[in-house]
């Protein structure tokens, strides 16, 4: 089976696509996955780094661009559809999955017109504009939150959760790493989050009495690293401040509490890794979807939410202290998070995709390929 994953822009769209691709290629040596995105999106760098091929199209978003900007970007669509048609003709995928972001629109619509089975994967509680539009034509809509189902026909909805990267799945099987002191993990996404970084520094004086009893690992992004490290030292903390955390699996396994944003991929990781959290939704997220995402964990008892307009150093310090000082509460939050986890999401989405392929092409392996044609796959780590 050959799958095409279309879309991207942010890690919240790209990483679930990579997680699904990892599942597909491990099922059969002839399976492969190709991505389609834009040169400006995160996919242009992280997809090749994951070992998958990527094709690029020229397209820009329409929402929030103003009338003039939207009209200019509309003029790019005919070219984007032509590029999509050429890519689809060249790769001949058996199924196309849109993961959100404006790059997915032309590819999924063109695939539908070519009678290739199509699906969308919606990561958030409020479906994005592109996925809402594509939902009218695709065969399946994979959702992670019950609230997202209202954007799609009921017969198309599969609420299976968000796929997470294979390395992070280790947390589902591995035990907690042993440590004596409470450990706090802070991050704002792959690029960091400036406002969150600043509020944590403001919280440190209110936690000064804990500096000998707490360990904090803080991912800041490149912009704030030096300033944040100085802030920790000024308050007497031994800093573990990093621009980027390469091994998030180990970071999750080694912490007792997480302070972070409320992107869908982050929440999927928190629930599979069974981590209590303090969530600070990104206020500029489209349709305020991070607040809706966070509420699902708050309502289940797995997290505390502080909206950024209410976030001060004192408020954040109080919440951190109350949770870290209450082991039984942390345990209850961890159990609640685990009940929301979907460790099988990638597998179950791949199962549905294979059924779509079987219905269209008569075999779960898809269309016949030319003799000698090698599948496009990431290199085998064992080789």
UniProtKB/Swiss-Prot annotation:
- Disulfide bond sites: none
GO cellular component entries:
plasma membrane
Q: Where in the cell is it found?
A: Cell inner membrane
- Region (Disordered): which ranges? 363-383
Q: Which residues form a coiled coil?
A: none
GO BP annotations listed:
carbohydrate metabolic process; cell division; cell wall organization; lipid glycosylation; peptidoglycan biosynthetic process; regulation of cell shape
The EC number(s) given in the record are 2.4.1.227
Q: What UniProt keywords are attached to this protein's entry?
A: Cell cycle, Cell division, Cell inner membrane, Cell membrane, Cell shape, Cell wall biogenesis/degradation, Glycosyltransferase, Membrane, Peptidoglycan synthesis, Transferase
A Pfam family this protein belongs to?
Glyco_transf_28
MF terms in GO: UDP-N-acetyl-D-glucosamine:N-acetylmuramoyl-L-alanyl-D-glutamyl-meso-2,6-diaminopimelyl-D-alanyl-D-alanine-diphosphoundecaprenol 4-beta-N-acetylglucosaminlytransferase activity; undecaprenyldiphospho-muramoylpentapeptide beta-N-acetylglucosaminyltransferase activity
For UDP-N-acetyl-alpha-D-glucosamine, which residues are the binding ones? 10-12, 124, 165, 190, 245, 290
Q: How does it sit in the membrane?
A: Peripheral membrane protein
Give the record's pathway.
Cell wall biogenesis; peptidoglycan biosynthesis
Catalyzed reactions: di-trans,octa-cis-undecaprenyl diphospho-N-acetyl-alpha-D-muramoyl-L-alanyl-D-glutamyl-meso-2,6-diaminopimeloyl-D-alanyl-D-alanine + UDP-N-acetyl-alpha-D-glucosamine = di-trans,octa-cis-undecaprenyl diphospho-[N-acetyl-alpha-D-glucosaminyl-(1->4)]-N-acetyl-alpha-D-muramoyl-L-alanyl-D-glutamyl-meso-2,6-diaminopimeloyl-D-alanyl-D-alanine + UDP + H(+)
Q: Which InterPro entries match?
A: GlcNAc_MurG (IPR006009), Glyco_trans_28_C (IPR007235), GlycoTrans_28_N (IPR004276)
State its role.
Cell wall formation. Catalyzes the transfer of a GlcNAc subunit on undecaprenyl-pyrophosphoryl-MurNAc-pentapeptide (lipid intermediate I) to form undecaprenyl-pyrophosphoryl-MurNAc-(pentapeptide)GlcNAc (lipid intermediate II).
Q: Which family does it belong to?
A: Belongs to the glycosyltransferase 28 family. MurG subfamily.
Q: Which HAMAP family match?
A: MurG
Question: Which named protein is this?
Answer: UDP-N-acetylglucosamine--N-acetylmuramyl-(pentapeptide) pyrophosphoryl-undecaprenol N-acetylglucosamine transferase
The organism is: Anaeromyxobacter dehalogenans (strain 2CP-1 / ATCC BAA-258)
Q: What is the lineage of its organism?
A: Bacteria, Pseudomonadati, Myxococcota, Myxococcia, Myxococcales
